[in-house]
């Protein structure tokens, strides 16, 4: 027993204690109890002691995990001040504010709670930006849509009366016919292929293809802005609902960087700028994040194919090459992704492309079509203003215009390239037709692709800002190239143009083999008609445009949509069973604009990406804030 071990203590009996000894024992015991319990209740609170009961904080990909404090109910996360890094959420908490109002976390990824497809809650690896969803509160970057719209110089849908000399009833009827064609194309797609990438009108089903990496609904997103500007309100709401409910980004295939950018991101960006609907902005930014791994190359020149599954840039071998028109047609969209997200990564990626191209030596001032993303050297000396090269030149002049005419680098690059093209590629046939040939190491192929027919409109668009002594020359050059492209249509049985046409052996502006005689609903010729019309108001461009409308109706319209044809030189051509998404995005849009007032999507306020999706010009105010950015 305890008392037996006290020195000098002799009990009177084996179990007895004298009264004074009992008193001393009780006094000692009470002091001991007081000391122990007093320390427990009276000592000041110590956060260090509290940490002894906490498991160490660990991080897992995409999450910040904190162990629960035993015996304590989780407290709600407090809203942090605007600038300092926010505190970690309370242990064990799944606070809706951590996913409804995500914030940047220095040194870590966002803590999110998925509310649907997994990709809606997870940023692309290595280039994450603050998540945002419809209805978000406290998002660190806000785009002021109303301020942006107030800076436009014309109403989006226009107000001015048509200034042509044609009877208004005739122009209105032509415009309504094109609107009906769009409505028919959309309704056919919705009935037989809704959610698929494109419609196959002969077999009345959908087609996915393999260049979108598993993404679906290319026709939906390509159609959004066309439906909006034609005021097909019910159809637009159908498309918008599909994007919000069914357009998912959790795909795992390999995708064309170029096609996803111009169709999906371009379509989503333009839909947002036209309507202010957050669903379009958010989807565009999230999809843009998924494209960023394509730029992880030794030079920063992106590879043409990106894997949505691994995030790799794909096929990264020393012998592979990137295509000029593909890596050169990202600038417009990526600047707007930065504009709408606040993430400078997008803009930095395309500025680096510009930097590489400025430094590299160019043969005779020309830009070959293939560049190694590994070495940064040209792979071949094949130069074309048609396929493989086309939209690179287009994006130079449009970058200048979209910047509010402040991007001097783009302007200089464009006019330098145009001078080289004139010097080495421009030709006039014996029959007087002006065309742009293809250049292969100094040897010319005297052919012009349908894709190159956009160049008439491009040159017209850039004529105003050329040196004064060159402006009239460029206007005339634009008109002559556009006339040549019209001839390629006029010289076919269907009055539709072939995929490519030649100038040799006494034959001009015609295809020389069946493999180049097809027409797949391409827009480039009517695109140039639209630009030339807006610049000159020469009625010939509306006449030529109406010829295309009639030919489309006669040879391409089927029971269930529009189809390309296999031979433009046959009066009874076979169909290719494909309604291209760009037919709704571009061909019908440009035709509609051709027969509309000039301030419907005024060129003072908008530039069109190479898929005809309108993106706004930067009308900066004196404070330097552009496009409503805060």
Curated annotation (Swiss-Prot):
Cofactor dependency: Ca(2+)
Residues reported in the UniProt entry to bind Ca(2+): 610
Pro residues bias spans: 80-89
UniProt-listed Pfam families: Glyco_hydro_47
Tissue: Expressed in most tissues with the exception of lung, muscle and pancreas. Highly expressed in placenta.
TM ranges: 23-43
Regulation affecting activity: Inhibited by both 1-deoxymannojirimycin and kifunensine.
Record field: compositional bias (Basic residues): 102-113
Subcellular location, record wording: Golgi apparatus membrane
Carbohydrate-modified residues: 250, 618
InterPro entries: 6hp_glycosidase-like_sf, Glyco_hydro_47, Glycosyl_Hydrolase_47, Seven-hairpin_glycosidases
UniProt membrane topology term: Single-pass type II membrane protein
Active site: 499
GO MF terms held by the record: calcium ion binding; mannosyl-oligosaccharide 1,2-alpha-mannosidase activity
GO process annotations (BP): carbohydrate metabolic process; ERAD pathway; Golgi apparatus mannose trimming; protein N-linked glycosylation
UniProt enzyme class: hydrolase
SUPFAM superfamilies: Seven-hairpin glycosidases
Residue ranges, Lumenal side: 44-630
Catalytic activity: N(4)-(alpha-D-Man-(1->2)-alpha-D-Man-(1->2)-alpha-D-Man-(1->3)-[alpha-D-Man-(1->2)-alpha-D-Man-(1->3)-[alpha-D-Man-(1->2)-alpha-D-Man-(1->6)]-alpha-D-Man-(1->6)]-beta-D-Man-(1->4)-beta-D-GlcNAc-(1->4)-beta-D-GlcNAc)-L-asparaginyl-[protein] (N-glucan mannose isomer 9A1,2,3B1,2,3) + 4 H2O = N(4)-(alpha-D-Man-(1->3)-[alpha-D-Man-(1->3)-[alpha-D-Man-(1->6)]-alpha-D-Man-(1->6)]-beta-D-Man-(1->4)-beta-D-GlcNAc-(1->4)-beta-D-GlcNAc)-L-asparaginyl-[protein] (N-glucan mannose isomer 5A1,2) + 4 beta-D-mannose; N(4)-(alpha-D-Man-(1->2)-alpha-D-Man-(1->2)-alpha-D-Man-(1->3)-[alpha-D-Man-(1->3)-[alpha-D-Man-(1->2)-alpha-D-Man-(1->6)]-alpha-D-Man-(1->6)]-beta-D-Man-(1->4)-beta-D-GlcNAc-(1->4)-beta-D-GlcNAc)-L-asparaginyl-[protein] (N-glucan mannose isomer 8A1,2,3B1,3) + 3 H2O = N(4)-(alpha-D-Man-(1->3)-[alpha-D-Man-(1->3)-[alpha-D-Man-(1->6)]-alpha-D-Man-(1->6)]-beta-D-Man-(1->4)-beta-D-GlcNAc-(1->4)-beta-D-GlcNAc)-L-asparaginyl-[protein] (N-glucan mannose isomer 5A1,2) + 3 beta-D-mannose
Region Disordered, residue ranges: 74-140
Function noted in UniProt: Involved in the maturation of Asn-linked oligosaccharides. Trim alpha-1,2-linked mannose residues from Man(9)GlcNAc(2) to produce first Man(8)GlcNAc(2) then Man(6)GlcNAc and a small amount of Man(5)GlcNAc.
Name the record gives this protein: Mannosyl-oligosaccharide 1,2-alpha-mannosidase IC
The organism of origin for this protein: Homo sapiens (Human)
